[in-house]
Amino acid sequence: MKRTSIFVVVCSLALLASGCGHDVYETAFAGKRESDAKYVGQAVGNFTADEWYPGGRLGTTLNVTEGCYEDETPAVNEMGLDRAFNLGEAAFERNFTINTAPFKGLGPAYLRTSCLDCHPGYGHGKRQDYYKAGYGNGYLLVIYHPADGANSDDGPYVAEVTGMPQTKAAAPFLPPIDEDRIVLDWVPVTAMESGLPMTFPDGEKYELIYPELSIPEEAFNTDPTPFQTGNKAVAFRLESTIGIIGTGLLDAIPEEDIKAQYQAEAPYVALNPAFWDKDANDFAATAWYTLAEGRFADGTPAPAGTKKLKRFTYAMTRASLQDGAGANAIWNITNVSRRDRPFLYTTKAWAKAMSENPEVIAAIQADPSSPYHADGTPEGIADAVLHLLDPSTNQFDNEWHNFEPEMGDDQYYNFLVWHRGLSIPRARDLNRPEVQRGKELFSEIGCASCHRPSWKTKSDNYWAPAILDGKPLPRYEEQTIWPYTDMIQHRLFMKNGIHGSWCRTTPLWGRGLSKANTGAEDRLHDNRARNVVEAIMWHAYSKESDAYRSTEKFYYLSAEDRAAVVEFINAI
């Protein structure tokens, strides 16, 4: 549960420790710390007064202690949405069960029992040494047919398991993937593909690791398996869940301002053609997401087919936060249905395999109360299983068994209030000269080109689904926010990189408090970076990386200046 503390004095944050000789980051500024409490809200050095409030006055919590990621925004308080926020928080934190109210409906196949499993401490997951779907493991499996038939980062998702593959199932069903057969190894990088040495000019070393994931064909409880379809080559990647704090503020960034950012970057770096038409100097047709019927914050109806610019997830597959990763995940991670989600998150290949499994059929036949029991014959049960597990079957209106929505409209509304109402902790230590120096260097070496410091929210005329019936959500009008992202995808060309190659620039705000909130400070899309320095240096693994030149400049900084950049990143 959240812990609220107003005008608290920031606790001392430990500097980065890479475990590979980075003592300089531990000691560079030891003994020089002064409390920032008396400076909060004041202009100091090269920081404006507003920069203490990364989420603006309506989106920032002054709490910077353990648990601050859980805090609601001042907008929630001002709009009188505290009760809805707290009830929505419960939906995020509690374990869903198969049939015990109020959090029921788990399965038949699922990824986790709780959102908190993937977002421990409201963070983005911790690096794991093995794959088990439990608390702290924020990893999602990525399974696809590699375009090169080997291990390319690119290629279409396999169709036999869901896009976010499931490793759990409610009895008597088998999970689509047997997680006991998943093998995860972390491999040390012995040399940078770019040729950049793995020792800084002053003698300090850095280490990098990357994941290798393998899943044998026998682990798949589907018919057919992915190894029998497509090009019959199957590749695997890991993606850790995205950060959730402050996402309502990102939803409030105007589309026209994001377009201006694309136009500003397009002359200097190749942008994803799926999002930007360079010749037209405008968004590509595939940059737009088609929404269901809804309503805008000002009360204007939004008919089905309304288009919004994609901006959420690494792959930028979602537009409005209210139909974004969290709104989707509360359904597909648990497979909990609601009135506007009458279909299961499953595949036809899994449904077929379960309908053909004699042990599954026998278990259902022995339980006449099962919704899959049908006429009680093996043939009737198999037919019911095949169709009721099929992702195209309306669970509330079919000829085999009509289920009821498992999440109520009010529950879903409360969840969206919570999701849009999560705050960003205030900045820390902006009064310190080394943090001010880090800010200067961050801009000078080019990091701010992609990690754009600030945006303005304007009217925040958000879209909301019709199921909310016009109920208000937290709104962030006319706020200056400091997320440090350009809201655009770039490519880093890492070893065993992200599926699809393109990844949206991750916001840096609040990440310096990850250790205090989650117990870990892992970074990048698969948590391969164990600290800030490793995250930075992965940007220079390949000379093809969009960030190679900036990272090369970081590499040649003095040890004290490198430490200043780290201090700055941990402060914002």
Language-model regions, residue ranges each:
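Hydrophobic helical h-region of N-terminal Sec-dependent signal peptides
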Residues: 7-15
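Electron-transfer interface patches adjacent to heme c in soluble/periplasmic c-type cytochromes
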Residues: 24-86, 96-416, 420-434, 439-572
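N-terminal cofactor/phosphate-binding cores enriched in small/glycine residues
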Residues: 89
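Bacterial N-terminal signal peptides that target proteins for export
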Residues: 1-7
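C-terminal motif of bacterial Sec signal peptides marking the signal peptidase cleavage site
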Residues: 17-19
